[in-house]
Amino acid sequence: MTAVSESQNRPYLDEFVALLGDLQVLSEGRKISRYLRDFSWYSPILENALADTSVDAVVRPRNIDELTAVVALAARHRIPITMRGAGTGNYGQSLPLEQGIVVDIKGVAGILDVAEGRIAALPGTIMKSIEEAARGTGQELAVMPSTYRVATASGFISGGSGGLGAAAHGDLWSNNVLAVELITVEELPRTIRLEGADVNLILHMYGTVGVITRVEMRLVPAHTYEDVLVVFDDFEQCCRFGWELVDSDIHARLASLQQAPIPAMMTPITHEIPEGSHVALVWSDLDDAASMRALAESYGGTVKAWPEGATHITQFPYSHTILWSRKAEPESSWLQCEYASGDKDRFIEQVRAVTERYPGVFLQHIEINTSPDRTVRCMGIPPLVGLANHEEALDELISYCTGLGIYLLNPHSYVVEEGGFVGDTERMLALKQEVDPFGILNPGKLGESFFSDRTAVVVSSERDMRAPEQLSGE
């Protein structure tokens, strides 16, 4: 069924077809189904809540003029809009809660400018392309997502938080997004530019605050990297190594700590890891190789070259770890949390307490990052295995960790505030009122509550467990 015949029930579809052409407006179920999935199925709660997501059409603008016209048309008809990049999000950021349109931003792509310390790109530009353009000038992105091969610029800053480079340069909020331009969702869209601290108003806001048209990101001098496995018999020693690595003069783009049995779930590299061992995934400057090895050995670690022919190291840390654990344990779940910052001894105490309380259940996966003032931050993305009653057990686990001083970031909600990343959203809500006066931009994701309305979990046995990179060609 074409968009034209579908428009008998939704007359506005004819206008989108007239604007973009029939091939750029999808409304047939099979064609739009891939736009109605992301990686929110990592959470059994969200998997259930978002199982029946539907949309009237997917529209695919190819440039800023077409994007602006699409937004204006949607505003005129008061049609709900959900912006979508590559669909690599984990919280249902780009899945619509109301009928309307999904706007596929990937066609609005291209590098706009590269200068010393900054790069500007259109919203649908793939992060890998941005990194390559930067490297062509002897620079690299300060931070990029582990899904950089497929993730878009606007998708990353709207739905992500940190990633590769955060070990050296911090997360998105660490002055790594320099400026953003967006258009308002009005019948005559206006352009608004945000710079400096004002950029924080749109970071990790799930595309609820304006439609992004330009992203400017921080660049730093390029490095040559080597990727290695550092194997440990003792996870606390692994944690001490990771902390000291990031706190040292060694330049690391990644320091990802994986407690056993997580390494055994990472099938492309398990043959290099003795059973029961813990692993640090390290992506560090080749010039610092000797110092990195000496540090690893001082904590009892064994450094191994990355297995030849194996999947690249960047497809194992951050939320990729949850993909591997869900493949190994299909009924597992996950959390996100932050351990003690700037206090190594307290961090180790928290690691020990969680291991003793939840052995084999709370599998500790910790990304060691930093902040602008060089404070070490320990971000947990743990798989949760064997929770008998998922929601009840999850609540108890969260309560225990909170009592230890571990700050919980809850990935089991599609509402910005309930995720825990952005804190007070008063200014964001005020900006949304200005840029989205009709409230049609990704409705239900900001200023709402999911936890109060959630229902019982029904686990699906039909999941597409391919990695984000494998889905990009569809």
Please name every model-derived segment:
Residues 1-72, 88-117, 260-270, 308-331, ...:
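N-terminal flexible segment immediately upstream of the FAD-binding catalytic core
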Residues 25-29, 59-61, 81-85, 103-105, ...:
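General beta-strand structural signal in soluble alpha/beta enzymes
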Residues 249-306:
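A conserved active-site cap/scaffold subdomain adjacent to cofactor or substrate pockets
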Residues 110-112, 123, 127-128, 132-256, ...:
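FAD-binding subdomain of flavoenzyme oxidoreductases
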Residues 2-4, 79, 84-86, 93-100, ...:
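Conserved glycine-rich FAD pyrophosphate-binding loop
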Residues 12-16, 74, 241-247, 288-301, ...:
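Short amphipathic alpha-helices in soluble, non-transmembrane regions
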Residues 56-61, 119, 226-231, 274-288, ...:
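Short cationic amphipathic helices and targeting signals
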Residues 16, 63, 74, 87, ...:
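Buried hydrophobic positions in well-ordered alpha/beta secondary-structure cores of metabolic enzymes
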